[in-house]
Swiss-Prot record:
Classification via InterPro entries: PRibTrfase_dom, PRTase-like, Xanthine_Guanine_PRibTrfase
Annotated residues for binding of 5-phospho-alpha-D-ribose 1-diphosphate: 43-44, 102-110
Membrane topology designation: Peripheral membrane protein
Positions bound to guanine: 106, 149
PROSITE patterns (UniProt xref): PUR_PYR_PR_TRANSFER (PS00103)
Identification of the protein by name: Xanthine-guanine phosphoribosyltransferase
GO process annotations (BP): GMP salvage; purine ribonucleoside salvage; XMP salvage
PANTHER family in the cross-refs: XANTHINE PHOSPHORIBOSYLTRANSFERASE (PTHR39563), XANTHINE-GUANINE PHOSPHORIBOSYLTRANSFERASE (PTHR39563:SF1)
Assigned protein family: Belongs to the purine/pyrimidine phosphoribosyltransferase family. XGPT subfamily.
Needed co-factor(s): Mg(2+)
Organism: Nitrobacter hamburgensis (strain DSM 10229 / NCIMB 13809 / X14)
Binding site for xanthine: 106, 149
Length: 168
């Protein structure tokens, strides 16, 4: 989505809802583990990774930083920070026993880059869109490809107009 375009559908997520969705993700992941470490895809994966790591009792948390957006404009993927060697070793170099966490898998471009780094890791996202869904192992909510998710850290308190024109 660019600054000059609007999403097909808006999906605002409150802090309470996001926390509930992260805990629901953890319930599903609890049956899959145990995990040696959590790898958050920054920045969106930081908050869900913290919640998931707490609930699963995982103490080792690492990050991989991949930039795919410049403000609201999609850009070429760029790895700013790789997974640490110590974390990669925990996964035997292939990611086995590692849990990758992100807020959203959209087109799957970021997921493909991380999968190439640690192919045997378990990939979890709170939300998934159809193009990215095949790349995640566990997710909670699927939204349509034309939906723009407004995460709580991107929102401020403001007037919300009615969905239907003239309904106010």
């Amino acid at each position: 989505m660019t600054a000059n375009t609007t999403p097909g559908k808006a999906f605002p997520v409150s802090w309470d809802q996001f926390h509930r969705d992260c805990r629901a993700l953890t319930w599903r992941l609890n049956e899959t583990g145990p995990f040696h470490a959590v790898v958050a895809i920054t920045r969106g994966g930081l908050v869900p990774a913290a919640i998931v790591a707490r609930e699963l009792g995982v103490r080792v948390i690492d990050t991989v930083c991949i930039v795919s957006y410049d403000h609201n404009q999609k850009s070429e993927l760029k790895v700013l920070k790789d997974i640490s060697d110590a974390t990669a070793k925990l996964g035997g170099g292939t990611g086995k026993g590692l849990l990758i966490v992100d807020d959203l898998v959209d087109t799957g471009a970021t997921a493909r880059v991380v999968r190439a780094m640690i192919p045997d890791a378990h990939f979890a996202a709170v939300y998934a869109k159809p193009l990215g869904k095949p790349l995640v192992d566990t997710f909670i909510t699927e939204v349509s490809q034309d939906t723009w998710i407004y995460f709580p850290w991107d929102l401020d308190l403001a007037f919300a107009p009615p969905l239907r024109d003239g309904a106010a």
